[in-house]
Amino acid sequence: MASTTPITMEDLQKALEAQSRALRAELAAGASQSRRPRPPRQRDSSTSGDDSGRDSGGPRRRRGNRGRGQRRDWSRAPPPPEERQETRSQTPAPKPSRAPPQQPQPPRMQTGRGGSAPRPELGPPTNPFQAAVARGLRPPLHDPDTEAPTEACVTSWLWSEGEGAVFYRVDLHFTNLGTPPLDEDGRWDPALMYNPCGPEPPAHVVRAYNQPAGDVRGVWGKGERTYAEQDFRVGGTRWHRLLRMPVRGLDGDSAPLPPHTTERIETRSARHPWRIRFGAPQAFLAGLLLATVAVGTARAGLQPRADMAAPPTLPQPPCAHGQHYGHHHHQLPFLGHDGHHGGTLRVGQHYRNASDVLPGHWLQGGWGCYNLSDWHQGTHVCHTKHMDFWCVEHDRPPPATPTPLTTAANSTTAATPATAPAPCHAGLNDSCGGFLSGCGPMRLRHGADTRCGRLICGLSTTAQYPPTRFGCAMRWGLPPWELVVLTARPEDGWTCRGVPAHPGARCPELVSPMGRATCSPASALWLATANALSLDHALAAFVLLVPWVLIFMVCRRACRRRGAAAALTAVVLQGYNPPAYGEEAFTYLCTAPGCATQAPVPVRLAGVRFESKIVDGGCFAPWDLEATGACICEIPTDVSCEGLGAWVPAAPCARIWNGTQRACTFWAVNAYSSGGYAQLASYFNPGGSYYKQYHPTACEVEPAFGHSDAACWGFPTDTVMSVFALASYVQHPHKTVRVKFHTETRTVWQLSVAGVSCNVTTEHPFCNTPHGQLEVQVPPDPGDLVEYIMNYTGNQQSRWGLGSPNCHGPDWASPVCQRHSPDCSRLVGATPERPRLRLVDADDPLLRTAPGPGEVWVTPVIGSQARKCGLHIRAGPYGHATVEMPEWIHAHTTSDPWHPPGPLGLKFKTVRPVALPRTLAPPRNVRVTGCYQCGTPALVEGLAPGGGNCHLTVNGEDLGAVPPGKFVTAALLNTPPPYQVSCGGESDRATARVIDPAAQSFTGVVYGTHTTAVSETRQTWAEWAAAHWWQLTLGAICALPLAGLLACCAKCLYYLRGAIAPR
C-alpha cells in the first residue's frame, strides 16, 4: 500500500518526469493526426498503448516542447544522466480529442491525480503574458531525451513602414528542435517559437510577431546564424520581420524552410546551407572592369617603366626669361659645347681675362660656356637673402669657323686647328649691373660629362630643370627595344653603364639611386604597380574602380531591402560600443631630452633617437689656413725659415713654406742703424729692392715707418725692430672629414606618460594609457641627412647637414658634392688664392673689427724682458675658398640632427575638463645664434616663464608656442639684431650672435635648361583639359557608380539610424 512505503522527493520527481514524457508523446501524436490522416498500418505492442489512449476529438496540439506541463525549469538544473536513460512509461494515456483547426487551443495541464484539465480559454494572445499562458511554462534549454545543443537567447527584429525607421528588438529562447509545423493552410506560425527572455515588446509588436506569414523575401546568414526576412500586413499596416531560424534539425538533416514566393537562393554548403550569392549583375560589373583594363593596356602600348621615377616638375611658360631668350625656348633641351679655363669675360666695355675676374678656385676645374644656337649665352646664380639671383646673357655671334675647345675633365691644351680658338664669352650687359663678386661658372661633376656650367647673375628667381622623361624605340638585336632619354634632370642621377644620361642617349636600361627604368614588357606589369597613378598605365583605372565596385556590390546586396539595416546591426554591429571621451586638453612639450609638462597627467620626453640607412660617401682633407711669424728687435740678414730658426718654429714654418699660394712679408719698423750699416729711409723703399741687393730674400720687404716700436723697449735712442709673417693654405696631416649619407630617416620620440612608456613616430603618433589617449603632433622626419665626421688633431666630432645636397644648384661647391677617396688623401676643391698679410699697430682702431676674407693681421706684443717682443696673428675668413674649409661645414650644419624647429604639441583626451592658461610674461635668457636673411634657420634658445604656454614672438614674427621651462627652436629671421622677444605681453632684449647675410651667400650653377617660377600661367582651360583628358575620362567613369553608391548609403543610413538604437 501507499501507506506502508513513504514517498520521497526522488520518487515524486521520477513520477513527474514519466508523466511529462507521456504528455509529450500524446501531444506529438495528436498534432500529427490533426494535420494529416495517417495511413493504416500494423503497429507493434510498444506503440499500441500510446495510440489507444489518444482522444481523436480533443483539441489540436502543436508539436514542440512548449506547454508540456513540466514543473521543473531544466535551464537551471538539468536532470542527471541516469534519469535521462530511463525507459518511457508504458502507462496508456487518454487520447486527446480533436478540435476544429481554426483556432489554436491552450494545452492541457497534467494533474496530480493522473487526470488532465484544460486551461481557461484566453483567445488569441495579445500580450506576452497571454502568450506565455497559452504555451505553458518556459521550455528547458536542453531536451531531456536528446543532447542537441541549444542557445540561451537569440534576437529577432520587427519594423513597420507606418512608423518609419523605428525598429523593435525581440529577445527570445530558441531550442534547436527543428522547424515548427505548418498550419493546414500552409502558413508558418512563429508563435510556437515566441518565448521572450528580454524586455517585453509592446502589445502590437507581439501581435505582429505572432501573425502567421508564409512569404520569405530573403535569407541572411553569417556563421552559425540564419535569419529569414518576411513582410506581411496586420490591420492594414505593412510589417517586416527578421526571424532567427535553426541551422540543422535533430536528425542531422538541414531544416526545411517555408516555401519562397518571391526569391529562392540555391547556394548551399556542407556547414552553412544558406548563404548570400552574387548573381549576374556582379559578374557583368567584373567583366566591364576587366575590359577597361584591357583597353587601357592596349592604349598604353610599349612604354618605358621606372620603378621609382623622380617627382615630376612641370615646366612653366618662359614669360620671365626676356625677349632675347624666348625664341630659344622651343629648341630646348639642347647640348652645349665645352669651354676652357682661359677664356675672357666682358666687364662693362672692356674684355678681361677670366683669371683677373673670376675667383682663383674657378680656374683649376674645368668649366665652359653653354652654346645655345648662334649666340654665346650663359646663366649665373648667386644665393643670398633667402633667394636666388639669375639672368640670361648673350653676346656677339661666334666666329664662322667653329673651334673645338678643351674638355671639362682635361684642362691641358687640346688639339686646335689653324684658326685661333674662340674665347669663351659670357657677356654681362647693362641689365646685370656688372659682375657680382663671388659668382662664376661651375666645375663638372663627371669626367665624361660634355656639358658645362653657365654664368649667371641678376634677376631674382629660382632655377629648375625639366622633368626626366623617357621613350621607347625598337632596334635590331636583343633585346629588340631600347630606352631613349627625352629630357634628363641631373639631380635624378640616371646613368647608363656608369655614364650620366643625356637627352638623346639610348640605353637598354637606366639606373639611378631611386631605381631602374626599362622598356621591357616582362617588367612592365611589376613596375606598373609603383606608377599606378600615371597617365600611361591603365592599372590606375583598376586601382580607382575596384574599391568602389566592391563597396557597390556589397551595399547593393545589403541595402536592397529595408531589412538590411536590421540585418547589419544584428549580424555585424551588435555589441559594438565605440569609445567616447569627455574633454580634450592641449599643451606643448619642448624637444630637449628631459623636458616635462602637465597635460593634465605628467608627460616627460625621455629621449630622442632616429633610424636610418647609411651609405659611405668617402673621406677628404679640408684646406687649412696656417700662419706664423716673428717679432725681432733687429733687422735679420737671412729672412727664411732657416735664418729665423731662433724665433720661428721650424715645423710649421716648413709646412707653410712648402704650401700653395704662399704669402711672405718682412717689415722694418723705424730702423735707423744696426750692425754698423747706415739704415736710411731709402734703404727700405717700397718693394725692398735696395735691401735685397745686400740681403737676398723671397719675401716682400716693406718699410713700416710710423708704427710703434715700443715692443723692443730698453734702447730709446737706438731702437730697431722687424716683423716677419708667413701664411699659406696647407693640407694639415691630422685634419680629415668623413662623409656619410643617411636615407629613410625616422625620428622616434620616447615619452613617459604618468609612468607609462611609449614611442611615437610620424607613422604612429598615439599613446594609449590608462589615463586616456595622448595624441602627439610630431614634426616631420628630417628626411635625408649628411653626416660630417670631423677628426681635428684627435678631437672627433660630428656635424649634420639637413636634406640631400643639390650638387647642381646652390650646394655645388659643398664638400659633400665632391669625389672623395677612402684614404682621406684628396683635398677638396681647387687651390685657393693667396692670403693677404697686414701689419697692424696695437692701438689701431682697425682691431675693433674682424679681418676680411683671406686677410691675416699681425700685431707686435711687448715682451716681459728688454728687447724681447712677441707677435699676435689674427686670420679672417678664407675668402672665395670658404666652402672648402672646416668653418664652412660649421656654418652650414648643425650638431643635433634630431632637433625640430618647434615644440611637440600634445592633445590629451580625458574624461574630465582641463584648461591650461596662457602666460604673458617675457621669456628670459633668450639667445639667438646663426644668421639672418641667409636661408638657414637661426637657433633661438631661452627659458619660458611658468603659468602656461608661451606664444613666442621675435621682432613681431610669431615662432609658435613653447611650453614652460627651457625651450630650443629654430626660425628664419628676416631682420638684423637687436631682437625683442615676448610671449604676447611685455618684451625683453635677447642676446644675439648672428652672421651678416653677405657672409652666408654662396654660388650655385645649373646645367642644361632652366625654367622660372612665375606668379601666373598662360594655360587656358581647353589646354588644361586636353592635357588631362585621361583623368577627366576616368573621373566621369567613376562618377556614375559613386553617385549610385552615395544614394544607396543614404538609404542605408536612414534605416540604420533606428536599427542601432532600437526600441
Swiss-Prot record:
TM region positions: 535-555, 1029-1049
Gene Ontology BP terms: clathrin-dependent endocytosis of virus by host cell; fusion of virus membrane with host endosome membrane; virion attachment to host cell
Glycosylated residues (UniProt): 353, 371, 410, 429, 658, 759, 791, 1011-1012
Bias type Basic residues, positions: 59-69
Ranges of Basic and acidic residues composition bias in the record: 70-87
Ranges where the record places region Disordered: 1-131
Cystine crosslinks: 153-197, 590-595, 619-824, 641-653, 699-712, 758-767, 807-817, 931-934, 950-983
Region (Functions as E1 signal peptide): 563-582
GO cellular component: host cell Golgi membrane; host cell mitochondrion; membrane; T=4 icosahedral viral capsid; viral envelope; viral nucleocapsid; virion membrane
Domain notes: Structural polyprotein: Contains two internal signal peptides that are necessary for directing translocation of the glycoproteins into the lumen of the endoplasmic reticulum.
Entry protein name: Structural polyprotein
Lineage: Viruses, Riboviria, Orthornavirae, Kitrinoviricota, Alsuviricetes
